[in-house]
From Swiss-Prot:
Matching InterPro entries: Hint_dom_C, Hint_dom_N, Hint_dom_sf, Intein_C, Intein_N, PolC_DP2, PolC_DP2_cat_dom, PolC_DP2_central_dom
Subunit structure: Heterodimer of a large subunit and a small subunit.
Family according to the record: Belongs to the archaeal DNA polymerase II family.
Name this protein carries in UniProt: DNA polymerase II large subunit
Pfam family, any one: PolC_DP2_central
Catalysed transformations (reactions): DNA(n) + a 2'-deoxyribonucleoside 5'-triphosphate = DNA(n+1) + diphosphate; Exonucleolytic cleavage in the 3'- to 5'-direction to yield nucleoside 5'-phosphates
GO MF annotation terms: DNA binding; DNA-directed DNA polymerase activity; single-stranded DNA 3'-5' DNA exonuclease activity
Region described as Disordered: spans on this chain: 279-317, 1041-1081
Keyword Nucleotidyltransferase: yes
EC number of this enzyme: 2.7.7.7, 3.1.11.1
Alphabetical GO biological process terms: DNA catabolic process; DNA-templated DNA replication; intein-mediated protein splicing
UniProt KW Nucleotide-binding keyword: no
Keywords: Autocatalytic cleavage, DNA replication, DNA-binding, DNA-directed DNA polymerase, Exonuclease, Hydrolase, Multifunctional enzyme, Nuclease, Nucleotidyltransferase, Protein splicing, Transferase
Amino acid sequence: MRPTDETYFETLETGLDDAFEVAEAARERGEDPTPNVEIPVAKDMADRVENILGIDGVAERVRDLDGEMSREEAALELVADFVDGRVGDYDTDAGKIEGAVRTAVALLTEGVVAAPIEGIDRVEVNDNDDGTQYVAVYYAGPIRSAGGTAQALSVLVADYARAMLGIDAFKPRDDEIERYAEEVDLYDSETGLQYSPKDAETTFITEHCPVMLDGEATGNEEVDGFRDLERIDTNSPRGGMCLVLAEGIALKAPKIQRYTRNLDEVAWPWLQDLIDGTIGADDADEDTPDAGSDSDATDEGDAPSASTDAEEPPRAAPSDKFLRDLIAGRPVFGHPSKNGGFRLRYGRARNHGNATAGVHPATMHLLDDFLATGTQIKTERPGKAAGIVPVDSIEGPTVKLANGDVRHINDPADALDVRNGVAEILDVGEYLVNYGEFVENNHELAPASYAPEWWIQDLDAAGADVQALRDSPYVDLTAPTADQAMAWATDYDAPLHPAYTYLWHDIDVEQFRALADAVADAHTDASDDDDRGVLVLDHTTTVRETLEALLVTHHQGDDTIRVDDWLPLARSLGVTESLDREWETLSEAAAEWPNAVRAVNEVAPFSVQERAPTRIGNRMGRPEKSESRDLSPAVHTLFPIGDAGGSQRDVADAARYAPDMSDTPGEIPVRVGDRVCPSCDEHTYESRCPDCGDWTDPHYECRDCGAVATPDESGRVECPNCGRDLDNVTTQVIDINDEYHGALRAVGERENAFDQLKGVKGLLSAEKTPEPMAKGVLRAKHDVTAFKDGTVRYDMTDLPVTAVTPAELDVTAGQFRELGYNQDIHGDPLEHDDQLVELRVQDVVLSDGAADHMLKTADFVDDLLTQYYGLDAFYDLDDRDDLVGELVFGMAPHTSAAVVGRVAGFTSASVGYAHPYFHAAKRRNCFHPETNVWFRDESGEWHHDPIETLVEARLDPDTADEDDFGALVQALDGDVFVPSVTEDGEETLQRVEAVSKHPAPDHLLAVETKRGRELTVTPDHSMRRWTGDGIERVDARELTAGDALPAPTQVPGDGETATSELRSESLDGTHPQRRFGDGGSVRTDEVVSVEPVRSSVDHTYSLTVAETNTLVANGLFTGQCDGDEDCVMLLMDGLINFSKSYLPDKRGGRMDAPLVMSSRIDPAEIDDEAHNIDIDREYPREFYEATRELADPEDVADLITLAESTVGTDEEYTGFGHTHATSNIHLGPSLSAYKTLGSMMDKMDAQLELARKLRSVAETDVAERVIEYHFLPDLIGNLRAFSRQETRCLDCGEKYRRMPLSGDCRECGGRVNLTVHEGSVNKYMDTAMRVATEYDCREYTKQRLEIMDRRLESVFEDDTNKQSGISDFM
């Protein structure tokens, strides 16, 4: 690491230490759930290992060893530290061995999986029959997640520690040896193993392994032969033991041998017999797999079929996937590969990287501001979506104005000046994509535009002194004069400069001939700007359309067309300066070519390249995002008030609430955790004793026998008498009025300090610990809200940036120098605000909205410190300039880890800029649309339908939330339930909280089971796998043949048909499946294959299921979709207010919570997507030429440097070069028109009006798609919802399946009303009819709308009172 990088990280960590000191002092004085900060700091992987294990000294020793040896060798080296007491504090030999084994597994799994904690139960030192002692390691099912190598090395580590401690080897009895063989076979047949050892191999390992492999029982099956053995506690298979023996030692024997050879104290010569395969050779099974092989499915990519015919120019094949599911208000900017659409240009700007696309800011304005910085688009290639960033060094759009001018617009100011006069957008400009995007998406390279950076290399290769030309004050290589361009082309036999290379591939040969004739017949008029004058052509339709297609700037009059700077055009047409045509006929090859490129090269005096062979279609996805993250509904305090606060959850209302006149106002029964004071034995729900002020502990008392219990090492609480699981949750009556006014007094505030204080109806955490209400009072005062973990958060669309200027971040060079920025990217001293500097890896740029929110949060934190904790203010900020240099947390989704960042400046865009390494990649994992799921609908009826049907019927694009990757998420109001399963295998019925629809990836995984079930999901879909002692969560890509997947036998609830169908789906009737779980009805099915398949769909679907996050899909229990949004939070807010005690006690409840904090980003430990960013300052000529051959990205990997090449070197945090400049990262609209326009009708009208202007868009097709994909599904879904709706009390929120006859609520007497109204059902009907007529849609579409209109009339129009005339009966 460079000294400057080390200094940077030390600065961050010093600030973090200072904040920790204050936060620790605050927590000791308050009433938080614990007196300590609950977010441990991890600088690196070594810290994560120490934090996950809680063993002091591990991190420092791991760092010492990390640079000297491999992690496997380091794991073995650490054994001596544990044995000698240099690491850890253990009194027994068993403790030392256990610490060494856990640390080895944690080190080998980088501290990110549960195996070191949950996969190793304990270590014991027991007696052999000869009086010596041996070591027994007790493994559990979660050891599977460690992988075979870590499993095997954990045994080696245990043996190494055993030898160093002088403990003898394990000496198994004969019946124990045979028991192991029977047990492994039983486990393999019941649950499945990646490698199935022969009986002889199992007995051989058991006999020779110097450590006893033991473990807890898994499942209900029992061995038949060797039962009730003295030294084995169970007759059931020990799943952890079986995994370590089979998938660890037997499968990874060659790897283990590498390390045993280097250890004097340990000798495992018997491994060679395993490796040679001589064990049990006489009765070997021919089908036994190779123990030393590891195989992974090969991903062949999903490159579209492209045109490489010798008689056609090479082209990437058009794809219209991005157009499907088009919705109203989000415009199309180009149909697939259509002329006039975005022109592909390769390169990377400094504000460009992961899943982003650069466009000219003039384009953003001329597309009626629908594109703003951070706006997501759905795109044709290379990926499926991209965030828009402004790049003004590429070409902007070409437009035709109402006055007849055709102009290139390369200045945002010009775009604003002319946009009201634009009659047609002939070309939307260039579209910058970096090579790394093609690598990341495994997409073949599409033919590159002929851009100046390629032409310069061609000129250099042709023999020109390019450096001398660069140095000349009279030459601009990117924008030369026409005479210079033509001279270079002829003198050096180089292609014509791109500035004068027109889009000859966009016209055919007949148009070429007609234009050549027109130019030869033209004349010139004198001009003050050009000695050659202005070329004047006769105005004909053919000439006009051809010039527009070529993007030749000109002025159209009624009778003539006038072209300035016309000579390059004439020479390209084979016409001389004197307007003489030099050719009569074209060759057969040129005449038959699909476009005019060959014709041009045949008649011109220079070579002409294809200017823009690749057009990229795209449309708007979701708008950019910058807003606070709130719970739904937003709350200020995590204090429960039940239903007493009404629909607004108003604490003041709850404080006054009394069900009856005889009740005391504010006394509300709520579910909270029972806690006890260890000093005075007072029972309370508070974290601190109200009598003596001591910290309280959760009190677990059995409701049946009254026994009091305490949690074991795993956190589980079990009654010592009854054996039942216990919790500390009780219903207590709390005086909300007293709490409310006590909170006001505690912080010295009055009720007029805020408009409303909102609490929660109930707590979702395991111990139901309420937050001090005083914190909520101060949040309400400063208008910030609480997230589920007690923190205040702000969401922003993430965009990458690798270099910035102080000026564009609204800060000064002086402020940057205070942050440690001393040099610009060229190594010059930083003295001016406009110098470009490389952004540090953990520095972030906040949106204006985020900055304002952070200021309010800082004021809240300062008030909290001074008024609640009695400490000095920490921030004391006056304006947003004071935020520069302050530390924040950035939350990386799905990691439960926070990354420390530092505020470097601000942006007017609604995004958050940061280094690509700071932005964590998102995951989305979902189902194929044809996956059948069981669900009970709002009316109580059971269905077994494709998940697409369930989701689409309930998804409203207008109200659904859309994330950074275009996924639509719709919260459900109605009661939809699905069969679900708990971690213990208990079947249950759970509510569907939301439905979601996601862009499909290029590849899916097809999982097939032994019973013939098939499930197609995304590779990272959250599956459920039976481990032998419960159900674990695992990515689909981690499944292997033999894995046991849970499957139900019945649908909970009513419905014989449903149960019967599901039973027939789950069972084949001939082979009984295994039952597991105490009393559960779940059975398992064995995986036989997991294969990658190319995706043939545009979207995948998922559900959000309460509590368990599982559902039945194609007859298997599996997980739902995961996903969270990136956010930032102020450092001190997170340190003081975050508590694990507030997190929901459900699967996923700990996701998106800062359970650990990384103070340093290690590039080697982040997602590979961030490594696929090219960092060169130019692409080589060979790369551009390869694109014209549709090469695979890997074929040119040696030509371009990716960030991954610097990982692990001193340069891993620096050297992020870029090929294209951006004058300001805030250029273009600050907000998308989608967010500034009012109603959906306004947005849709703007969408269709833009389609009229764009040459690259067919407006009729857009109108058709809006009707087909948005309006009709919406009308149909709303009508269905109307017919199945519930009714709801307007006062208390009570729901009824049917309207009470009285019309009044049975609970509170309030008015009961419909939840779906006529206006929301037919809101798009009139608009859809108008659009269909105005844009001349197909008769089929119009007839569908007419039928829908009649259905609506039949439901909502009352014809019973319609007055009839006599003519109605004649």
